[in-house]
Structure formats: structure tokens, C-alpha cells
């Protein structure tokens, strides 16, 4: 059963990790997929080729979502190429970790701009389309760190907490237009970034999780498929952890 057949989806920051898996799952479930990448050009181009094997329309865009004019241009281009837009997954994000006393203003600003401002930029631009259509689903990627904080990640935690407050507000503002806004909060998920860590460190983290394992990108992507589908039509303004019971 394909849950997203006939829907047009945008996934930001989809060249690798969780974003890439979301793009794959959306195409697998029948969605036409627009996605963005920025620095990982080769991976972005490779993903576009890969997703075409699912038989849906796919196009990648090199775009910096942290810049408002680029976000507006992105939505304009998607409308020209796909005709409309039903689902937005705001996934673009970075980390620049460091203790508060060692954190530079630049590292604070970079993380807030890319992680939080990009969500505002893309959501504002895309909401015009959804308001006109009187339907739509925003799926915004936060983190368990945005709920509970984490030493050495004040900038990242602040950006992810901001996404939660923003998303709940948008759910209240746009609910009357049949537009939903939900938050996914991943915990410890196995990606390319975790693959380079010491296996003993990874195992130590996993043992602190009630399910005693790291999550997989599939775990996050499957939830996003549900939130983008009509099966979640009465769910909005929620923060849903994918964390094996960490929270």
C-alpha cells in the first residue's frame, strides 16, 4: 500500500543521513519528490538518479534554506516543475558543538540560521501554496536535545527547541485551513556521522536507551511517511520522539 501516492513533497537537506532516507521512503510510497542539498553536490545528484528508479517524479535543487530569498525561489521553482506542494519536511540542519564559554558568536549564529531560520523561511514560502489549496502537512525535524538540552550543544538545543515552539504556533495559525504542523524528535540514530565513532562509545550510549539499541534512519522516515499521509489527518501540533524511550 502506497501511502503518499499523488502527493508532492519537499525535503530539505536530503543528500545524506535521515533526510536521504526520508526522500527514499517518500518515493517508495508514491510521492513525487523535490529535495534540496547545498554542500554535498555529488550526493545530491546521485540521490536524484537513485530515486527515479521508484517511478515517481524527482528533482533536486541546490538551495540554501537559511536565506529567505533562496527559500522563496525554491518554492517558485517547485511550483513551476511540479505544479503544487502538499508536504514539506524541514530537515536541513548542522551541528557546531562546544561548551558555552568556548562557543563563538559565529558558531551560535550559523546553527540558529541553518537549523531554525531555515524552517521559518521555507514554511512561510510554502504556506502560501497550502493556504490556497486548503491542505498541507509540515513535518519539522527537531531532536530529543531540543526537549531536554545537552551540555556542549547549547546552540543546537536552542535551535531544536525553537522548532518545537514555532511548529506548535503554526499548527494553531493554519489549522483552520486544514494545514497540519508536527515535529519529529529523533534520539540516537545511526547515520554516517555515528559510523565513524568508537564502537564502544556507541554501545555505551545504546545501553542507556530502554530499547538497548540505536535507532535507524528508517525509524524516522517511517514516521514522516505517516505524518505526510492522510492517515494522520487529525494529528497536528505534536512532538513525536523517535528515541527508543530516551525521553
Where are the regions that the model predicts?
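Residue(s) in the substrate-gating loop at a strand-loop-helix junction
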Residues: 143
Amino acid at each position: 500500500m502506497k501511502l503518499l501516492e499523488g502527493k508532492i513533497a519537499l525535503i530539505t537537506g536530503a543528500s545524506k543521513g535521515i533526510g536521504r532516507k526520508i526522500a527514499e521512503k517518500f518515493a517508495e510510497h508514491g510521492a513525487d519528490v523535490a529535495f534540496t542539498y547545498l554542500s554535498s553536490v555529488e550526493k545530491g545528484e546521485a540521490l536524484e538518479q537513485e530515486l527515479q528508479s521508484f517511478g515517481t517524479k524527482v528533482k533536486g535543487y541546490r538551495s540554501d534554506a537559511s536565506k529567505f530569498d533562496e527559500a522563496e525561489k525554491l518554492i517558485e521553482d517547485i511550483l513551476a516543475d511540479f505544479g503544487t506542494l502538499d508536504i514539506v519536511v524541514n530537515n536541513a540542519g548542522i551541528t557546531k558543538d562546544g561548551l558555552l564559554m568556548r562557543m563563538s558568536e559565529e558558531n551560535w549564529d550559523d546553527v540558529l540560521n541553518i537549523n531554525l531560520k531555515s524552517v521559518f523561511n521555507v514554511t512561510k514560502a510554502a504556506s502560501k501554496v497550502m493556504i490556497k489549496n486548503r491542505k498541507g502537512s509540515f513535518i519539522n525535524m527537531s531532536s530529543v536535545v531540543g526537549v531536554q538540552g545537552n551540555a556542549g550543544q547549547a546552540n543546537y538545543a536552542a535551535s531544536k527547541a525553537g522548532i518545537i515552539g514555532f511548529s506548535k504556533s503554526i499548527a494553531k495559525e493554519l489549522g483552520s485551513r486544514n494545514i497540519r504542523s508536527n515535529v519529529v524528535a529523533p534520539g540516537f540514530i545511526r547515520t554516517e556521522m555515528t559510523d565513524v565513532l568508537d564502537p564502544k562509545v556507541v554501545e555505551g550510549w545504546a545501553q542507556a536507551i530502554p530499547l538497548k539499541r540505536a535507532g535507524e534512519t528508517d525509524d524516522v522516515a517511517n514516521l514522516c511517511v505517516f505524518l505526510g499521509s492522510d492517515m494522520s489527518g487529525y494529528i497536528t501540533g505534536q512532538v513525536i520522539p523517535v528515541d527508543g524511550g530516551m525521553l
